[in-house]
A protein has these predicted regions:
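Short catalytic/metal-binding and nucleic-acid-binding patches
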Residues: 1-169
Length: 169
């Protein structure tokens, strides 16, 4: 089956990247995730707009300078993290750290962007990792609060009907 990706110049892309068998290793390896991100941006230029890191998956929105490269960005990120994770392990615990593919969605407009931003930031609550959005430290939520785009209590006293049943994983 041929999978066709949509490429919109100067576009934003929502991504979901999941560990193989949903092994919960990501939040215990934030330093390695940061190293992997820093390795990737040396080769592929993109802005990281928003993110949420959960133990077994990552949601993010990126804006690649060259839109056609977002698949290469994901591949490079997975490779870098896997390489760094396995360094020093005599017998790597997991032969494959990531699911083969990733979920991607091209953001269509401002409303679509807002829905995906809300989904990203509410996701740790949805999965039971935090009681409120502000309690989860592995996301870009506070960056958006600082810019005045979210109230600090967003998600705990806000109607979230538009995102509660969404599943972008």
């Amino acid at each position: 089956m041929n999978y066709r990706r949509v490429f919109i110049k100067n576009g934003l892309v929502f991504l979901t990247i999941v560990t193989n068998d949903r092994i919960p290793i990501l939040t215990d390896n934030i330093k390695l995730l940061n190293q992997s991100y820093n390795n990737v941006i040396k080769y592929y230029k993109f802005d990281l707009i928003a993110y949420s890191i959960l133990p077994e998956h990552i949601h993010c929105i990126i804006k690649p300078i060259i839109i056609e490269e977002y698949s290469k960005i994901v591949k490079s990120f997975k490779y870098s993290f896997t390489k760094n994770y396995n360094v020093g392990l005599v017998n790597p615990t997991y032969k494959r750290l990531w699911q083969n593919r990733f979920w991607e969605h091209t953001i269509r407009d401002e409303n679509d962007l807002n829905i995906h931003l809300n989904y990203i930031h509410y996701n740790p609550v949805k999965h039971g990792y935090a009681k409120s959005v502000k309690d989860w430290e592995y996301s870009s939520f506070y960056k958006f609060v600082k810019k005045g785009l979210y109230d600090i209590n967003w998600g705990s006293n806000t109607d979230i009907k538009e995102i509660i049943d969404l599943d972008f994983e």
